[in-house]
Amino acid sequence: MGIGSRSSMMLAGALALGLSIPSLAADRQMERLTRGVAVTNVGSGVLVSWRLLGTDSPDTEFNLYRDGEKVASIGKTDGTNYLDASGTTTSKYTVAAVVNGKEGAKEGVSVVLDKTVSNSGKSFPYKTLKLEVPAAQTMPDGEKCTYTPNDMSTADLDGDGEYELILKWDPSNAHDNSQTGYTGTVFIDAYKLDGTRLWRIDLGKNIRAGAHYTQFQVFDYDGDGKAEMIVKTADGTIDGTGKAIGDKSKDYRDASGTILKGPEYLTVFRGVDGAAISTVTYEPSRDINQHVKGKDAHGYWGDNYGNRCERYLAATGYLDGVHPSAIFVRGYYSSSYVAAYDFDGKDLKLRWLHKSEYPGQGLYGEGNHSLQAVDLDGDGYDEIFFGAAALNHDGTLRYRTGLGHGDAHHIGDLDPDLPGLELWDVHEHTDAQYTEEMRAHDGKIIWGTPQPSSGGVDNGRGMAADVDSEYRGYEMWSAKGGGMKTAKGKLIGTPAVSQNFRIYFDGDEYDELLDGAYVTKFNSSSKKSEVYFDGPAALGATGCNGTKNTPSLVADLFGDWREELVVRSEKDPTLLYIVSTPVESKLRVYTLMHDATYRTAVASQNTAYNQPSHLGYYLPDMVKSLKQPAVVMAGEELAPPDTTPVVNNGKSELDASKPKEGDGFTESTNEGFLENGYFNFANSLSSYGTWEIFSQKEAKTTLTIRFTNGGTGDRNMSLNVNGKSAGTISFPSTGDWTKYSDATIDVKLEAGVNTLKFSSMTSDGGPNFDMFTFGIDGVELYDGTQTIDTSTTIATFVPFKTGVMFNPATGMLFTPKAGFAEVYFYDMAGNMRMGVSRNVPAGSTPMALDRDMLPKGMYVVKVKVDGKLMHAARMVK
């Protein structure tokens, strides 16, 4: 979506109705987690902590039991942790939520950190995982390589509500893309927190090892409660069940050890066993001449040895505002390609492909060694941060700054007094205007440090974190930026602070700094960093990725909101450490993993030059007024699979040459059309067409589209019917613009007015549309005069079993218990058009609604009780 379009419309509507402004974001699909009760050894007793889940009311109380006896009651504003001086790691703890004085089910322990190490005056709890190291390998040139643990991710792979760890093994001969040489095989393992290995995937000899090659995304993409892994594969990749992808006999390595030939794939692996589910061709291939006609042998990559074409990035984001999509990138030094994919449980489908192939345009040359999908402007859809440029959720260009490539970025509510999220970026190009800069959600530079007048510098490190309690907002600094600055750009000083990672590791609302396994705390009074945890000295732990010295993973894996540090042993590759906070916290904070900004950042943390995760809100403000996140658990409160039978017992033919609106034009230049011409979509990724049609009845039927495509390639389009995705349609080449063909897709029509929106998925735009044919009678183009027999048609489309019902025709709400009720009406574009809220008793209550204020059309009605979505229905007025 373009900047501000949805948010401005919804804001105006809310103000006109005199309502407080609700969140623009829809409820986002998240993992269904347990309480994650953690019992950790802190020397003098145990620290017990647990999650405040995104589905909990902010003032949920808790009872804590040890060996069946209650040892603590946790109040409405207390932190979800308790230091039990009399407890041990073998004690049996349970936690129960208490809502309105009623205790719920007790949940047991998820993880025990039974070990402790004394360091810097505190006892740090930790546990170790024993890993199965891949065997050493010998390369074709006789060189040998060994393995150490490298980057990691986390997700619930088996649906038990607990996180598993996904680990990439790094061979000792891994190479940068600019270097020649053979590399060992890349392996990816999955482990449960008790050390059980679930599977190992062997990416094979045709995938090279190095920081810029294998970017793996692990997330529950299909919403079945079990995560999948998506990663680039090739001939010879062996899945977790031992089955090969492609031809495992093929070896595409050349004499220098590089790989510039052979098919390239993108594969979805099942989380529970590592089985390959769906494999598609990686888009685009490394041969840029298939996409752009180069001026010489180098084409537009800028080299012919695989440096620029073999640089990959990956991220996960909510491109439709509700469900996660996977995003994969090829190239950022020159030509740049971004492909977004959706997974429906069976097939991996391309949502869109963005191409930036010409210098000075789009994403060309603007990429970082990192990628992040995040809702920058609060419109409910995730944008894609690329570096010095960004894309909108639909793959169109959001902005280009022209500042070029960079090595580090940070995104969060860096300045809580500004709208949206802000970005901190450092730049490698010595001719860039700034060496470091803070950027607004729309790409405008808020402030920056200009390059020195004596000559530009290559700024390779940068950090943003909220470390100084004296100043509101984050602090920012970089390797060559001249010191630490506030969110307003004020120079604080030049303290000796690390420029690597951040972590919540103590009990306050401010960041600690992390360099490998070394944690420091910034002293706001002395303006100096103080050692908080010396992991190398205490445990012999270390980071990975050479001089980058990043942790394998930092994430809120269990317990309360504090983060866990996952690092490897420097000397023993079989040993992995999970270290947690040593102290209590009075702060009540929702599990960080139910904040979408943070959760997707954890998913992309392993990408290339690992970047730390930040929250989508300003924590010091949040702890003062805790707000429940807008989330829905995977598999819960979502529309079920549509089993409506397809009806094709009639025929309705419609002229498709004139949509209600669109990016294109109606013409009759080329022969072969049947009625008044055809609609010619613009040749761009942003082209679309919207048609309003009227149906006399509700039915699921087949839509046949008569089209012509005189181009050389497929022109795929996505179809949304009444604001809901109906799928993707392939429009292959017909060979000539006067030759027509048919494409079909099943659509579900409501009785009354329906909106069909076709959106292009390639930069070539769409084909030419001539006719629509529906498989039922009584369908026609809507001209504003047709009406349906009844004034209101209601079709419940979310199978809630809550007992809450709302009748839009009468305004009557029924709730089985008393509570605070909210009723909102949304149009099919997602804009809130009307709303009302009040405290209601159990039983039937009239809600004061003036339906006459709504124009004719279709609406989604959502009902929340005590902050939870309890009922949803469609209404046609």
Predicted segments, located by residue:
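Solvent-exposed loop/turn segments flanking beta-strands in beta-repeat/beta-sandwich domains
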Residues: 53-65, 820-821
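Surface-exposed, short loops/turns at beta-strand junctions within beta-sandwich domains
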Residues: 85-90, 748-750, 851-856
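C-terminal tail/sorting-segment detector
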Residues: 795, 835-837, 848, 852-877
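Extracytoplasmic
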Residues: 186, 191, 639-789
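Surface-exposed, proline-anchored Ser/Thr-rich loop/turn motifs
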Residues: 788-818, 825-833, 855-856, 874-877
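Structural beta-strand segments of beta-rich domains
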Residues: 35, 44-48, 689, 701-703, ...
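Beta-propeller-forming repeat regions
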Residues: 30-34, 52, 77-643, 721
